[in-house]
Amino acid sequence: ILAHSKNGKGEASRRIHRWARRYGLRGGESERPTLLNSWEGVYFTFTEKVLHGMMKRAADLGIELFVLDDGWVGGRFPRNDARAGLGDWQVNRAKLPHGLEGLIRQAEKLGIRFGIWVEPEMVNPHSELYQNHPEWVIGLPHRENRLERSQYLLDLSNPHVCRYILDAMRKLLGGHPGISYVKWDCNRKISDPGSPWLDACRQGNLPIDYVRGYERILETLAAEFPDVIFQACSSGGGRADYGTMWKHHEFWTSDNTDAYERVFMQWGIGHLFPAISMAAHVTASPNHQTGRSASLKFRFDVAMSGRLGFE
């Protein structure tokens, strides 16, 4: 990407923004809904009743979309913390006895939209998927695979893995047409770069084949669910690049939601990315990451310089 300007950095930045909105982002010239994301409000510890209350208060404030973050996955390994459940993508009926369908109905009743968090590229050791397919995980032979955030990385160079992820997301979105927003998370890097799928002479292809598998999944989902907004989240802005963003509408700028620190992040990112691409949320004071207190007006001012949301 090259921008030319005779009038300094500001004009070059605005030219990149115009290009990005037209060509570099999905839906770059469409309006974004304001949203309430559940994460910092409840983390993993929520019930259906608690979520209904959050949705009601969001609707009363005029917020247009409610996003259920991590903690909704169930099955044999319910996800009540970060150590279990990733990869299984079944609803935790102990927390949500009426399933996602019940939450979607409640959102529709309140006149707001519904979104969901997923992390399809990851798997916990405590999951049905890992127990059935340990060979689907990226790792080096004859070495203990290293956990990060209690999870392993699935091998997207393997077409069977990509097919599993695609089928799981099709089931989630196709079975719940009321889902209008997906927060696609990715909370760890490749730390043990070996593929059980690739031949020895092709091990160096892993990073490229991984990205190609990821792109094929997102391209397919975008074609099959064109009205669903996709956010790229990677422990914050780990995927804030134009190679990724033409498959996503926006990115989560940082897991650090301190408004003061976000000023500098958003200023820097704003040189290359338009405001519509940066998710920025009003969060609690004191802030959960830094402990810093800030006025509600200041937190709003900072969040409104991106795509406005709330936690």
Residues covered by each model-derived region:
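Active-site neighborhood of glycoside hydrolase catalytic domains
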Residues: N92-G99, Q106-K109, Q131-K297, S305-F310
